[in-house]
Amino acid sequence: MTSITGMIDPFLLLATESHAEGEALIGFHFDFLESNILNLAILVGVLVFYGRKVVGNILSERRNQIAQAIQEAEEKQRTAAQALAKEKENLAQAQKEAARIHEAAIERAKTLRAEIAAQSERDIARLKETAAADLSSEQERVMAQLKKQIAEQAIVKAESQLKAQVDNNTQQRLIDRSIARLGG
């Protein structure tokens, strides 16, 4: 109690002095040395009394806004982390699929290379056979033509020799003999 009465006594003293001079109980003095401390004390008291609620409300509201912003940021972070994990999984699957497609393409290329090589060998063998057959048929044609020419030349030569060696009488005897052999 002594501390309260100790604070009230100077206040009462100032109030009685100001009342004695004809001023109000609490007044504002514009004399710097006399009234500045009292005015500041009153201003601080009013600010503390009324400002506590206002500042408390502002701080509470700000605290709630910050907490809500933190919760929203954490939720966004969780959502982003989930999306990132899903996209990483999709990327891994896509990379596996790309590797599988690449391996399949390599295998297909090897298979096609082998098929093309085999087909080329078959084509070469067929061309060789065709060329050999063409060569063989050409040889046969040339041989047949040569035989025909030789036979024609032999007949021409034989006829010329027969004409030179055989007279009409000998020709008639050969004809008769040939007819007799044939059954006539």
Curated annotation (Swiss-Prot):
Keywords per UniProt: ATP synthesis, CF(0), Hydrogen ion transport, Ion transport, Membrane, Thylakoid, Transmembrane, Transmembrane helix, Transport
Family matches, as PANTHER family: ATP SYNTHASE SUBUNIT B, CHLOROPLASTIC
Signal peptide: none
Subcellular location field: Cellular thylakoid membrane
GO cellular component, one term: plasma membrane-derived thylakoid membrane
Function field: F(1)F(0) ATP synthase produces ATP from ADP in the presence of a proton or sodium gradient. F-type ATPases consist of two structural domains, F(1) containing the extramembraneous catalytic core and F(0) containing the membrane proton channel, linked together by a central stalk and a peripheral stalk. During catalysis, ATP synthesis in the catalytic domain of F(1) is coupled via a rotary mechanism of the central stalk subunits to proton translocation. Component of the F(0) channel, it forms part of the peripheral stalk, linking F(1) to F(0).
HAMAP family: ATP_synth_b_bprime (MF_01398)
UniProt GO MF annotations: proton-transporting ATP synthase activity, rotational mechanism
Membrane-crossing residue ranges in chain numbering: 36-55
Family of this protein: Belongs to the ATPase B chain family.
InterPro entries: ATP_synth_b/b'su_bac/chlpt, ATP_synth_F0_bsu_bac
Protein name: ATP synthase subunit b 1
Organism: Crocosphaera subtropica (strain ATCC 51142 / BH68) (Cyanothece sp. (strain ATCC 51142))
Complex formation: F-type ATPases have 2 components, F(1) - the catalytic core - and F(0) - the membrane proton channel. F(1) has five subunits: alpha(3), beta(3), gamma(1), delta(1), epsilon(1). F(0) has four main subunits: a(1), b(1), b'(1) and c(10-14). The alpha and beta chains form an alternating ring which encloses part of the gamma chain. F(1) is attached to F(0) by a central stalk formed by the gamma and epsilon chains, while a peripheral stalk is formed by the delta, b and b' chains.
Membrane topology type: Single-pass membrane protein
Pfam families named among the record's database cross-references: ATP-synt_B
